[in-house]
Amino acid sequence: MAEEKALNDQMLARRQKLATIVDDLHLDPFGKRFERTAKAQELHDLYDNSTLETLESEQHEVVIAGRMIAKRGAGKVIFADFRDVSGKIQVYAKRDDLGENYPIIKRADLGDFLGIKGIIMKTEAGELTVLATELTHLTKALRPMPDKFHGIADVETRYRKRYLDLIANEESFKKFQLRSKIISAIRAYMDSQDFMEVETPILQTEAGGAAARPFITHHNALNIDMYMRIATELYLKRLVVGGFERVYEIGRIFRNEGMDPKHNPEFTTMETYAAYMDFTDVMDETEGIFKAAASVVSDDLKVTYQGTEIDLGSNFARKHMVDLIKEQTGIDFWQDMSVEAAQKLADDKHVKYEKYWGVGHIINAFFEEFVEDTLVQPTFVYGHPVEVSPLAKRNAEDSRFTDRFELFIMGSEYGNAFTELNDPIDQRARFEAQVAERENGNDEAENIDEDFIEALEYGMPPTGGLGIGIDRLVMLLTDSDTIRDVLLFPTMR
């Protein structure tokens, strides 16, 4: 109650100052267009190495604008810190220099936006400063800013009111700048590899391309239920059928599933498809993407995640799923075995399984139980069973497995790729097997997408496809332990 009263008192005081801006200073409290000549960081880059004497003699005039985040002094002299998108810089305001302009900064509260024209200088302590010669009021903040020393204590508030988090937490602000730069670096790499960026439907009549539970909505004009997409895969493959040999899409995906530090119902992925490539080529492509992204934050392509150094500059390891299981458990799934034999092995090792599972499902469960957490450095795990890979091409040497890989780092999956299944007959059989699983209780199994099968019947060249979780990659590169820290507006109750 006391905190609420203090907040109300501060807001009342700011409203009163708002009135004085109009009545006494005859200014628009919410400003208008303002043209600046530099941002804060540009000034630091240009003049940080200049001496006090040099700046005093050269008299460089600049015009800046930003939010006031600190203020010291209240008489004839005021020092204040202003922040813009690039960083912060100190402003030195003197009543004798500014005259009738001086009340603009004297009456300003933390959070207000001002425009400042002035001369670049350095203080005796060596801090780069703008000596104000003219002030412009741009926006009055009617609510007090979060405490700059304690920030926002309530984590929920940080996520619900991200704008406050960005104001109070410079680390968070920079993290989202890095996210943008990482995605830009990925796009630049894809451009260099002759990929074309495309956009595919978010509202779809079939929820396909992944094993996930969709969000369902209703299209009133068409009077049909539709699904928020759970993957971009099937539409991108249609484009390969149509003749676009290298395509990719970065966009939002929606899955109506649980939430935890690594999962949000709405998240960003990148999927790529390249004609005449197979999954080994896609491994090379994936390394290129990760190296391009890592270059944004690290010159040597090494990053530290939760205290562990991850080397993204070296060649990523490549290991078959069955070999990794044998290394960890001694069990050899290369040998042919019945479902009953696989179930007994699972029982012996206390691995849970569903009644409808085949041997391939159990192999995958062994991998998840005994191997995933051991994969710290970047590792391509390939050779997934057919049962858990309905869209991947069978391996030519052992048809129980597919030409598919997942990239694991720190025990988490960062990418999923395969030589795409382009045989429409086999694809239909895989979809039908998925339908059977759904009837036996797997509500994440895929439906039959007749239009996609028809597209394959027109012929899709051998193709390598890749899916990467952008949010998880940003988490890795910014050392964030929860996906909510890299989503500007995460899903909240």
From Swiss-Prot:
**Which PROSITE patterns does this one have?**
AA_TRNA_LIGASE_II
Residues the record lists as binding Mg(2+) 2 = 413
Q: What are the protein's UniProt keywords? A: Aminoacyl-tRNA synthetase, ATP-binding, Cytoplasm, Ligase, Magnesium, Metal-binding, Nucleotide-binding, Protein biosynthesis
Entry cofactors: Mg(2+)
Question: What single Pfam family name could you report for this chain, choosing any that match?
Answer: tRNA-synt_2
InterPro entries linked to this entry? Aa-tRNA-synt_II (IPR004364), aa-tRNA-synth_II (IPR006195), aa-tRNA-synth_II/BPL/LPL (IPR045864), Lys-tRNA-ligase_II (IPR002313), Lys-tRNA-ligase_II_N (IPR044136), Lys-tRNA-synth_II_C (IPR018149), NA-bd_OB-fold (IPR012340), NA-bd_OB_tRNA (IPR004365)
Q: What family name appears in the similarity comment?
A: Belongs to the class-II aminoacyl-tRNA synthetase family.
Q: What is this protein called?
A: Lysine--tRNA ligase
Taxonomic lineage is: Bacteria, Bacillati, Bacillota, Bacilli, Lactobacillales
